[in-house]
């Protein structure tokens, strides 16, 4: 009885072994192969001279390789086909792997590597394409495929590229996709880059100058071109941007004020600080109306941004006509510029001048014959613009007067010292 009781637990143990059979260990060879691949990826790229020697030796030994040679493109196990999707593209062969290197060069590079481990079935993972895919996930620097400069076709086709040093291959610029007919050296690339920077700077300065040229009328520009002055206008665009400059200037020429060529000539007395300070406060809206002038006042301009091209002495020595100093004739010309010439006779009969024009409201405009609400709204809007421009002009004159006073004080102190 006792012996039978002792046999039962022993039998139960053997029964458990039968119920749960022994299994083989998990295959961790793929992870080991990946770890070895990452370690190999930290090697530096071979130099051009070494690649050239290995290529020549590979070409010599290409015909002597028999069936006993080293096989690098074999893809034996189905596990590799399942776990490496980088080689299963439709363009690649069924059993081979995709690589950018020629077969002779790849064979010579494999000869420098240590002897293969027992995991020979994972050998096809050691090419450039799968290495880049695996190394990108782990963050280690991948061993990139040799560029077109190091390929044997490039060496045979361009023998002058051999004297380049090894530092050229490690240039900071990214490798360009080379074609068999196009090969740009570093100097040519630098010239193209400098040309791009020059054009970019020219385009920005052109856009700034076009903003100023939009405020000039076509009549004043024609008078500048006809005058034949040696000092050109600072608002003229570049020669290769002439068409766009003319187009933008013609769009804003109907509403911009006129000015004589005297105010558009560049004066060498103008300092850069005065030009920058005047350009901040003296920029009226681009839709400002045309300011008419009688024959005695054609050489004067009412807006202060025309003084950017003249000296501060000329700006203060001349009395610029503002809206408050308009005569009834100038008011009539202003109405003609707004296409409201049918009301010019009534304004001339009432002797409406500049100060009276600024005081007009809706009821006064109705009494002057502007029965159309659209015309009244147009006149009111233009009057607001005139008042704002006059206020800006007054502030600019005050600021320029203060600047001139400061300059005189500095010159006086400099003379004393």
From Swiss-Prot:
Residues 37-306, 390-417 are annotated as: Disordered. InterPro entries: Neurabin-like (IPR043446), SAM (IPR001660), SAM/pointed_sf (IPR013761). The modification Phosphoserine is found at residues 84, 108, 173, 179, 279. GO terms for molecular function: actin filament binding. CDD domains: SAM_Neurabin-like (cd09512). The modification Phosphothreonine is found at residue 283. Residues 326-389 form the SAM domain. Residues 138-153, 244-260, 276-289 have a biased composition (Low complexity). One of its GO terms (biological process) is actin filament organization. Keywords: Coiled coil, Phosphoprotein. Residues 40-49 have a biased composition (Basic residues). Residues 375-416 form a coiled coil. Residues 159-173 have a biased composition (Basic and acidic residues). Pfam families: SAM_2. The keyword Aminoacyl-tRNA synthetase does not apply. One of its GO terms (cellular component) is actin cytoskeleton. It comes from the Eukaryota. This is Sterile alpha motif domain-containing protein 14. It comes from Rattus norvegicus (Rat). The gene is Samd14.
